[in-house]
UniProtKB/Swiss-Prot annotation:
The keyword Transit peptide applies. It is found in: Mitochondrion. CDD domains: EF-G, EFG_III, EFG_mtEFG1_IV, mtEFG1_II_like. It comes from Talaromyces marneffei (strain ATCC 18224 / CBS 334.59 / QM 7333). Keywords: Elongation factor, GTP-binding, Mitochondrion, Nucleotide-binding, Protein biosynthesis, Transit peptide. Pathway: Protein biosynthesis; polypeptide chain elongation. Its main location: mitochondrion. Residues 1-24 form a transit peptide. PANTHER family: ELONGATION FACTOR G, MITOCHONDRIAL (PTHR43636:SF2). Residues 102-388 form the tr-type G domain. This is Elongation factor G, mitochondrial. GO terms for molecular function: GTP binding; GTPase activity; translation elongation factor activity. Belongs to the TRAFAC class translation factor GTPase superfamily. Classic translation factor GTPase family. EF-G/EF-2 subfamily.
């Protein structure tokens, strides 16, 4: 039965401008919209009885009502974003737009290094028809995986840059076929390239988190989990490598629950394991699923599941329903009533809980063995959101950065985010996620950061290092454009809106080294490469040390910097000399010290005069420095106080102890004096710097060193050797785990003690050990190390003065 509200919704629904009659899909969409809670369409003023027999008048009434509804939504999106639900936004999407956007999935594949991300992506591309044959990582067949387009990636067998592609997947179930469009990004697993994961997750609507069936949740899995939570990205999980010895998917699920603190349950159980892994049992439909064909491209479903698996499948289905009852109200009600939920109710609950970030369904298979990848793709369609189901906020610069909810409508003013830059043979390629409106070839767009207008000459869809030209891209899609000069994280609009979007989190570099070209004639290419790498990678920093007259590069680890040095040699033909890696030490103080500093230079003519009085003390945390003024009675004017703050900020950039940045220091100025003619902004800036340096050295200064969260995995027979290696480096061992044939050690290590660790680990474990390091926190350096660093700094200063 159609309620009156549904009739009104139906009559007010937007139609295609090229049609004057109602099409069946629009009828269905109208009823779909009206059934959503909080639908605004039911409130439209147009009624079914008001439509006359005139097609032209009918079209004008429909168009005006639709435009009015959209305008009302746009006003509410700006005025009250929290009060506007996604259901209301979805209910007002045009029928044709809904047909497109409801089948779009923007997803990323992320995991710990060597969990099989790129191998799984290769199968996804093959099964969706995007590539004609499968190639493996490490270039074992002289081709290499499609998504690893750089020679370095194929040689080393690791992903260095995130790679974007698109493909179409036809989901088949119970005789029905539905075509979905995936925008897919394969990300690196190594912690040194974590910025690639950050910027991918910033623009994606969902993700596939891959885990190893043997190792379960590993160190980088925890990092990826933290990144997904930072950007509120729903995820399904895929336990890979089910064909490996020691595979235990249920241990991995338990670790998701305990280590990641995210409710998880299997939606499949394996048929066999290790070298006898054959397929999976779908716990929702209770069917056995097998892969056949040379590369597992044929899916065979059987109603009869193996007899010995029935008790396991029934038990795991019960656990799935119980877990859902804890995170979904509808299933909880059914569970409490002791009723059995239908398959559709279970699937709907999984979808609701996954999108609400309360749950992750766990699939399982083996990418390398070509088994059970297709059911995971069905899971992407069933449980991950389309772009209209995700809340995306912008900041309105005209209203003091008030939050605004973006509407995924093609008819609205364009808003997009540039999330990745890449140099190609045709110039700079800028990856853009379109959040609102439509981006068209030849259109003018405005960079919100500098209000600069640029024309979009070409729009392409990327497939690794290949591209396909398109004329326009709608809301919710990802594309790349040429000829747009910008920085990573810039917001683009069509000029109608003064919106900006929050950028991605960029971690601070922890390691530096000096670099210079071996041949001076390569200086031009050297500078060009440095500028490009900085523009593409926000975690790669380049600076010039005026005292040592050296170019310094900084990054996330030894591998990170080594890759850029090697890329410079290959891509720019520049051989470089590098110095010893330098640790990014920090300086701080240990106690409060008061100061009263006078800068006075009066020798005829304009002089300098500035007096600053106050104190310095440790701030609440080692995160940032703080400057405060507590002047009463105007002893120092406002413009001079601004100069004092500038002097403080300059002083913290290079501490007086060993010349490194200062952390966790607070400076308060509460009194001072000025001179009628000799005081200036420069005087107060210099006086503040001098007062800072003097007070700093009197306040028990000490050096801080970066501690790295280190995880080492190796075969069990090498456990003693690995522990010995860590003890030699004064590591603090926090935890250890022993598996079937390997063990894992979790430790905090000083970065300074970890240089060269990889070669020692390889030697101690016959090349079978691996480790990852991630910055943890800064901690007070040992007294002997501080003494050595201070002496080294003072000697370097003395040598420069001699010159």
């Amino acid at each position: 039965m159609v309620r009156p509200a549904q009739v009104r919704a139906f009559s007010g629904l937007a139609r295609s401008a090229t049609s004057t009659r109602l099409i069946p899909s629009q009828c269905q969409n109208a009823l779909r919209c009206a059934s959503l809670p909080g639908s605004r369409l039911s409130a439209l003023p147009l009624r079914a009885t008001q439509i006359t027999s005139s097609p032209l008048r009918k079209w004008h009434q429909i168009r005006n009502a639709s435009a009015a509804a959209t305008a009302t939504l746009a006003e509410q999106a700006a005025a009250d974003p929290e009060g506007l639900s996604q259901e209301e936004i979805i209910s007002n999407i045009d029928a044709e737009e809904w047909k497109r956007i409801s089948k779009v999935r923007n997803i990323g594949i992320a995991a710990h290094i060597d969990s099989g991300k790129t191998t799984a992506t290769e199968r996804v591309l093959f099964y969706t028809g995007r590539i004609n044959s499968i190639h493996e990582v490490r270039g074992r067949d002289s081709v290499g995986a499609k998504m690893d387009s750089m020679d370095l990636e194929r040689e080393k067998g690791i992903t260095i840059q995130s790679a974007a592609t698109f493909c179409d997947w036809v989901k088949k179930e119970d005789g029905k076929e539905e075509k979905y469009h995936f925008n897919l990004i394969d990300t690196p697993g190594h912690i040194d390239f974590t910025i690639e994961v950050e910027r991918a997750l910033r623009v994606l609507d969902g993700a596939v988190m891959i885990l190893c069936a043997v190792s379960g949740v590993q160190s980088q899995t925890i990092t990826v989990d933290r990144q997904m939570k930072r950007y509120n990205v729903p995820r399904i999980s895929f336990v890979n490598k089910m064909d490996r010895m020691g595979a235990n998917p249920f241990k991995a699920i338990d670790q998701i629950n305990s280590k990641l603190r995210l409710p998880a349950a299997a939606v499949q159980v394996p048929i066999g394991a290790e070298d006898e892994f054959q397929g999976v049992v779908d716990l929702i439909r209770m069917k056995a699923i097998y892969n056949e064909g040379p590369r597992g491209e044929v899916i065979v479903e059987k109603d009869e599941i193996p007899e010995h698996l029935k008790p396991v499948a029934e038990e795991r289905r019960r656990i799935l329903i119980e877990t859902l009852a804890d995170v979904d109200d509808e299933i909880a009600e059914i569970f409490l009533d002791e009723r059995e939920p239908t398959n559709e109710q279970i699937k709907d609950a999984i979808r609701r809980a996954t999108i609400a970030l309360k749950f992750t369904p766990v699939f399982m298979g083996s990418a390398l063995a070509d088994k059970s990848i297709q059911p995971m793709l069905d899971g992407v369609c069933d449980y991950l959101p389309n772009p209209s189901e995700v809340t995306n906020l912008a900041l309105d610069q005209k209203r003091k950065e008030a939050q605004v909810k973006l509407l995924p409508y093609g008819s609205e003013p364009f808003v997009g985010l540039a999330f990745k830059l890449e140099e190609s043979n045709f110039g700079q390629l800028t990856y853009i996620r379109v959040y609102q409106g439509t981006l068209r070839k030849g259109a003018n767009v405005f960079n919100a950061r500098n209000d600069k207008k640029v024309k979009v000459p070409r729009i392409v869809r990327m497939h690794s290092n290949e591209m396909e030209e398109v004329q326009e891209i709608g809301a919710g899609e990802i594309c790349a454009v040429f000829g747009v000069d910008c920085a990573s994280g810039d917001t683009f609009t069509d000029g109608q809106l003064a919106y900006t979007m929050s950028s991605m989190f960029v971690p601070e570099p922890v390691i530096s080294l000096s670099i210079k070209p071996k041949n001076n004639k390569d200086s031009a290419n050297f500078s060009k490469a440095m500028a490009r790498f900085q523009r593409e990678d926000p975690t790669f920093r380049v600076s010039y040390d005026a005292e040592s007259e050296q170019t310094i590069i900084s990054g996330m680890g030894e591998l990170h910097l080594d890759i850029y040095v090697e890329r410079m040699r290959r891509e720019y033909k520049v051989d470089c000399e590098t110095g010893q890696p330098q640790v990014a030490y920090r300086e701080t103080i240990g106690r409060r010290v008061e100061f009263d500093h006078l800068l006075k230079k009066q020798s005829g003519g304009p002089g300098d005069y500035a007096r600053v009085v106050g104190w310095m003390e440790p701030s609440d945390s080692l995160e940032e420095n703080k400057f405060e003024e507590q002047i009463v009675g105007g002893a120092i004017s406002e413009k001079f106080l601004f100069a004092c703050e500038k002097g403080f900020n300059l002083a913290t950039e290079k501490g007086p102890l060993i010349g490194h940045k200062v952390l966790g220091t607070k400076m308060v100025i509460n009194d001072g004096a000025t001179h009628m003619t000799d005081s200036s902004e420069m005087s107060f800036k210099n006086a503040t710097q001098q007062a800072f340096r003097k007070a700093f050295m009197e306040s028990q200064p000490h050096v801080l060193e970066p501690l790295m969260k280190t995880v080492v995995t190796a075969p069990i027979e090498f456990q003693g050797d690995v522990i010995g290696l860590l003890n030699k480096r004064n590591a603090t061992i926090n935890d250890s785990e022993i598996g079937v044939d390997e063990f894992t050690v979790y430790a905090d290590c000083s970065l300074n003690g970890m240089f060269g660790f990889s070669s020692h680990l390889r030697a101690a474990t016959q090349g079978k050990g691996e480790y990852t390091m991630e910055f943890s926190h800064y901690e007070k350096a040992p007294g002997q190390l501080q003494k050595e660093l201070v002496q080294k700094y003072l000697k370097a200063q003395a040598d420069r003065h001699k010159k």
